[in-house]
């Protein structure tokens, strides 16, 4: 084998086919075998992001995949991140740093520049690791996106790597998805596809076998395995909000999250989804905010626009009513900014330049600035002095007298966020609060839950990554997979 590592790419017939999950599974499976493996996604479009060890920003799916590889997240793992901030545009992040915002047409022309960043990152990873496990984006068969593609076959052709194609049988039409995708590829791209993985199968595999035999005969390519449907697997969603709940018994704390048009980092709420004593509700447009113990205003990629949407839906009045009845209110990142008195965007970073009135629940004002704050932090919650870890991803600078009552004191001595005088309203810039067991328990007690069961979310995520690797061992053709990775079979 050459000094450079081997590259294997997972592409999907559709969005949500299981690419992120399969890459996570393969990464941990190889890591357990002692293989130096690293995840890579050339281009990601998502509002869920993570802060890296080198002080940049990547998609959260790649951060989970890094954990599967037993590595710290690094910006080379996701060199191009697109964070939508309007219906037709997105903030472009290259090597972890925001470069500019573009509409779709401008970005299409920019792809040649983006590809240089992609190939530079891949080259560094291939030089440092034995296997680079790559995740594609969406589908390689999107005809309108084929020109200058950097996310799927355009990348695979550029680095000359084999491809596995995964499809979700649970949504139906799996054979049409697989065969149709192949038909829409060029001859050279079709040759790169070395096998199929069918995901989320329920039932008797013997009943599926005739279809698998037909697929192999029709395409001349092997089925590398069929992964079962796993209903209780809980890893961060790349983009869509995961509303599944763990089994709940006994008294539960009611937590409501208003879903704003540009909600970001909604993975903040995954620990609450899984907590056996929390009933978590995401409330969308056209719905009234139900009665709750705690309302959480989430992060936002376009805070002033989302604040306007919140008012249009009448949720501002519902929040004030909630507080009058003794409920608790928490704002995270953009949610903190909404809690203040004014929000200023003089540079037009999130849309038209200007200022907006906040909800006026904390004596704060925020000004958006070009330099984004990206940090992994540790500190203590003002409630119960509970230790916590989290991360900052924001462009706002917040000032005001409410900061004299911080929500968090960080280990570097900085104060973060604020609390109201009556203690019913709290805001923080820190994402990931609920992942820290002690901080999560303290927040739930603050919101009214008397006897809190401690849940170790980090341990749950690690357990599920291990389960995924077990599924690879049991259900996939590991010999063929090792060959594709250039690894010995023994």
UniProtKB/Swiss-Prot annotation:
HAMAP family for the chain: CobQ
Residue numbers annotated as active site: 333, 431
InterPro entries: Class_I_gatase-like, CobQ/CobB/MinD/ParA_Nub-bd_dom, CobQ_GATase1, CobQ_N, CobQ_synth, GATase_3, P-loop_NTPase
Any one of the GO BP annotations: cobalamin biosynthetic process
CDD domains, per the entry: CobQ_N, GATase1_CobQ
GO molecular function: ABC-type vitamin B12 transporter activity; catalytic activity
The name this protein goes by in its record: Cobyric acid synthase
Database matches in Gene3D superfamilies: 3.40.50.880, P-loop containing nucleotide triphosphate hydrolases (3.40.50.300)
Cited NCBIfam families: cobQ, PRK00784.1
Keyword vocabulary terms for this entry: Cobalamin biosynthesis, Glutamine amidotransferase
Classification via Pfam families: CbiA (PF01656), GATase_3 (PF07685)
Family to which the UniProt record says this protein belongs: Belongs to the CobB/CobQ family. CobQ subfamily.
PANTHER family: COBYRIC ACID SYNTHASE, DETHIOBIOTIN SYNTHETASE
Taxonomic path: Bacteria, Pseudomonadati, Pseudomonadota, Gammaproteobacteria, Pseudomonadales
Pathway: Cofactor biosynthesis; adenosylcobalamin biosynthesis
Gene: cobQ
Entry superkingdom: Bacteria
UniProt KW Transport keyword: no
Signal peptide: none
Function field: Catalyzes amidations at positions B, D, E, and G on adenosylcobyrinic A,C-diamide. NH(2) groups are provided by glutamine, and one molecule of ATP is hydrogenolyzed for each amidation.
């Amino acid at each position: 084998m050459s000094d450079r590592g081997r590259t294997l790419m997972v592409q999907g017939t559709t969005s949500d086919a299981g690419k992120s999950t399969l890459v996570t599974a393969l990464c941990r499976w190889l890591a357990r075998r002692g293989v130096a493996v690293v995840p890579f996604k050339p281009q990601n479009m998502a509002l869920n992001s993570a802060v890296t060890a080198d002080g940049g920003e990547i998609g959260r799916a790649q951060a989970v995949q890094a954990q599967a590889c037993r590595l710290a997240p690094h910006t080379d793992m996701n060199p191009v991140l697109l964070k939508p901030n309007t219906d037709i545009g997105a903030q472009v992040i290259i090597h972890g740093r925001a470069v500019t915002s573009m509409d779709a047409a401008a970005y299409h022309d920019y792809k040649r520049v983006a590809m240089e960043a992609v190939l530079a990152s891949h080259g560094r990873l291939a030089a440092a690791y034995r296997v680079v496990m790559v995740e594609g984006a969406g589908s390689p068969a999107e005809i309108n996106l084929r020109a200058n593609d950097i996310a799927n076959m355009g990348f695979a052709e550029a680095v000359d790597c084999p491809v596995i194609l995964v499809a979700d049988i649970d949504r139906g039409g799996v054979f049409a998805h697989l065969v149709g995708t192949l038909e829409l590829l060029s001859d050279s791209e079709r040759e790169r596809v070395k096998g199929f993985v069918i995901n989320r199968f329920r039932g008797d595999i013997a009943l599926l076998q005739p279809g698998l035999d037909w697929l192999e005969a029709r395409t001349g390519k092997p089925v590398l395995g069929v992964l079962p449907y796993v209903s209780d697997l809980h890893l961060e969603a790349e983009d869509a909000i995961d509303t599944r709940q763990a089994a709940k018994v006994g008294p539960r704390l009611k937590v409501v999250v208003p879903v704003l048009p540009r909600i970001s980092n909604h993975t903040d709420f995954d620990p609450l989804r899984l907590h056996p004593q929390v009933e978590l509700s995401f409330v969308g447009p056209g719905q009234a905010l139900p009665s709750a113990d705690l309302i959480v205003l989430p992060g936002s990629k376009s805070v002033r626009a989302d604040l306007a949407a919140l008012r249009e839906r009448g949720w501002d009045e519902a929040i004030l009513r909630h507080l009058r009845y003794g409920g608790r209110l928490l704002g995270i990142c953009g949610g903190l900014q909404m809690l203040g008195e004014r929000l200023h965007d003089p540079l037009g970073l999130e849309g038209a330049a200007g200022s907006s009135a906040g909800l006026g629940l904390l004596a704060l004002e925020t000004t958006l600035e070009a330099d984004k704050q990206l940090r992994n932090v540790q500190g203590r919650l003002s409630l119960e002095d509970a230790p916590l870890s989290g991360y900052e991803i924001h462009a706002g600078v917040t000032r005001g007298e409410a900061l004299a009552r911080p929500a968090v004191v960080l280990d570097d001595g900085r104060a973060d966020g604020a609390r109201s005088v009556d203690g019913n309203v709290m805001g923080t810039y820190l994402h990931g609060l609920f992942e820290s067991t002690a901080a999560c328990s303290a927040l739930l007690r603050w919101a009214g839950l008397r006897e809190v069961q401690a849940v170790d979310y980090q341990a749950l995520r690690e357990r599920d990554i291990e389960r995924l690797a077990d599924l690879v061992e049991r259900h996939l053709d590991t010999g063929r997979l090792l060959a594709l990775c250039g690894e010995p079979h023994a």
